[in-house]
Swiss-Prot record:
<keyword id="KW-0963">Cytoplasm</keyword>
<dbReference type="InterPro" id="IPR012340">
    <property type="entry name" value="NA-bd_OB-fold"/>
</dbReference>
<comment type="similarity">
    <text>Belongs to the RuvA family.</text>
</comment>
<dbReference type="GO" id="GO:0006281">
    <property type="term" value="P:DNA repair"/>
</dbReference>
<dbReference type="InterPro" id="IPR011114">
    <property type="entry name" value="RuvA_C"/>
</dbReference>
<dbReference type="Pfam" id="PF14520">
    <property type="entry name" value="HHH_5"/>
</dbReference>
<feature type="region of interest" description="Domain II">
    <location>
        <begin position="65"/>
        <end position="138"/>
    </location>
</feature>
<dbReference type="InterPro" id="IPR010994">
    <property type="entry name" value="RuvA_2-like"/>
</dbReference>
<keyword id="KW-0227">DNA damage</keyword>
<dbReference type="InterPro" id="IPR036267">
    <property type="entry name" value="RuvA_C_sf"/>
</dbReference>
<dbReference type="InterPro" id="IPR003583">
    <property type="entry name" value="Hlx-hairpin-Hlx_DNA-bd_motif"/>
</dbReference>
<dbReference type="GO" id="GO:0005737">
    <property type="term" value="C:cytoplasm"/>
</dbReference>
<keyword id="KW-0238">DNA-binding</keyword>
<dbReference type="GO" id="GO:0048476">
    <property type="term" value="C:Holliday junction resolvase complex"/>
</dbReference>
<feature type="region of interest" description="Domain III">
    <location>
        <begin position="142"/>
        <end position="191"/>
    </location>
</feature>
<dbReference type="Pfam" id="PF01330">
    <property type="entry name" value="RuvA_N"/>
</dbReference>
<dbReference type="Pfam" id="PF07499">
    <property type="entry name" value="RuvA_C"/>
</dbReference>
Length: 191
């Protein structure tokens, strides 16, 4: 199995990316949450992966965090949910939002995801209730490289290394990069 790919981002076009690993380009489908947090083309990227082997293809799916990959794998276990639908769910809802919807049995949040109807949403809520990924067991795992991205953004905005490092350490784990930057800026403006 291919568990992680590290290389240079060669191209990106939603929902796919091409990662060049020593001259071999891997085509990887990613949820939009991962896509929006990717570096620029030509920069180094690392993605956790899930390899799906079908009769007619070997497909790679990439994720920015272990939590996201674990959620994808749990979604695949739900009857009637394939890889494309699982990616659609993770593109439409963050793992934390999906976890909250499952815990509260909020069918309305799930049916807003393109490709998910009422029956599929009901099945999803029923089959995923109580799963550790969605019960919060993995919710504290930070995104791969998220804290470094936040630190780099704050340094680019003119904050010094000491205050940046202290602020990043205080951020809650598991935040998306954009939200982490917003919270860090709020914390720095209060200091």
């Amino acid at each position: 199995m291919i568990g992680r790919i590290t290389g240079t981002l060669a191209a990106k076009q939603p929902p796919q990316v091409l990662v060049d690993v020593n001259g071999v380009c891997y085509e990887i489908d990613v949820p939009m949450s991962t896509f929006y947090n990717l570096p620029g083309i030509g920069e180094k990227v690392a993605l956790l992966t899930h390899l799906a082997i079908r009769e007619d293809a070997h497909l790679l799916y990439g994720f920015g965090s272990e939590v996201e990959r674990a959620a994808f794998r749990e979604l695949l276990k739900v009857s009637g949910i394939g890889a494309k639908t699982a990616l659609s769910v993770l593109s439409g809802l963050s793992v934390n939002d999906l976890s909250a919807a499952i815990a509260a049995q909020e069918i309305g949040r799930i049916v807003k995801v393109p490709g998910i109807g009422k029956k599929t949403a009901e099945r999803l809520l029923l089959e995923l209730k109580g799963k550790p990924v969605f019960a919060g067991a993995l919710a504290s795992v930070p995104s791969a490289g998220a804290s470094d991205d936040v630190r780099q953004a704050l340094l680019a905005l003119g904050y010094n290394e000491r205050e940046t490092a202290a602020t990043v350490r205080e951020l809650p784990a598991g935040l998306a990069v954009g939200e982490a930057i917003r919270q860090a800026l709020r914390a720095l403006s209060r200091a």
